[in-house]
C-alpha cells in the first residue's frame, strides 16, 4: 500500500512539473499581446515564409480566389489546407508598414486568395499595382513571419 501511495505521489509531482513547464513564460506579455491584437490565447498561429505579389505580374488578376477584388496590403494568398479561406490574420511583422494611401499598416490581412506555389507554411502578400508597390514590403520577401488567425470575414474583404 505504501509503495502505491509513493508511486502515486511521485506521478502527481512529475505530472505537475510537466504542466508547469508548459505554462507561458511571460503571462503578462501574453495578456498585453492578446489585448493589442485582439487574439485570444491559444488562437491558431503559424510561422510562414512570405513572398510578395502584385498586379501586372504573370498570372495575377484583379480578383482573388473568392471572386473579390484584391486589396493592396490586405489580401493574402494562403494554402487552404493550412489556413482556411476567409480567415482574418494578424501578422505582427507588418505592423507599421506604409500603406498605399500613406497610412500605417495595423497588421491585419485577409486570407482570400490561393496560389499554385503556395503550399504548406507559405504566404503570398499582395502589395498593389506594379512592381514598385512591393518596395515598402521588400524586407518581408522570403522572411519568416508569424500569422495568427484572429477571426473570419463574410463576403469580400474590406477595401
Where are these regions (language model features)?
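Bacterial N-terminal signal peptides that target proteins for export
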Residues: 1-6
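Solvent-exposed, well-ordered loop and adjacent helix/strand elements within mature globular domains
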Residues: 23-159
Amino acid at each position: 500500500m505504501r509503495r502505491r501511495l509513493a508511486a502515486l505521489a511521485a506521478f502527481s509531482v512529475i505530472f505537475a512539473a510537466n504542466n508547469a513547464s508548459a505554462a507561458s513564460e511571460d503571462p503578462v506579455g501574453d495578456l498585453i499581446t492578446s489585448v493589442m491584437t485582439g487574439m485570444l490565447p491559444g488562437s491558431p498561429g503559424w510561422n510562414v515564409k512570405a513572398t510578395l505579389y502584385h498586379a501586372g505580374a504573370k498570372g495575377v488578376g484583379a480578383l482573388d480566389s473568392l471572386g473579390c477584388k484584391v486589396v493592396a496590403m490586405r489580401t493574402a494568398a494562403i494554402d487552404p489546407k493550412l489556413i482556411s479561406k476567409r480567415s482574418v490574420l494578424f501578422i505582427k511583422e507588418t505592423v507599421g508598414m506604409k500603406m498605399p494611401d500613406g497610412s500605417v499598416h495595423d497588421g491585419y490581412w485577409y486570407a482570400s486568395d490561393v496560389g499554385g506555389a503556395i503550399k504548406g507554411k507559405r504566404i503570398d502578400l499582395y502589395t498593389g499595382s506594379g512592381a514598385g508597390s512591393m518596395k515598402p514590403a521588400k524586407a518581408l520577401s522570403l522572411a519568416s513571419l508569424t500569422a495568427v488567425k484572429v477571426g473570419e470575414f463574410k463576403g469580400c474583404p474590406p477595401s
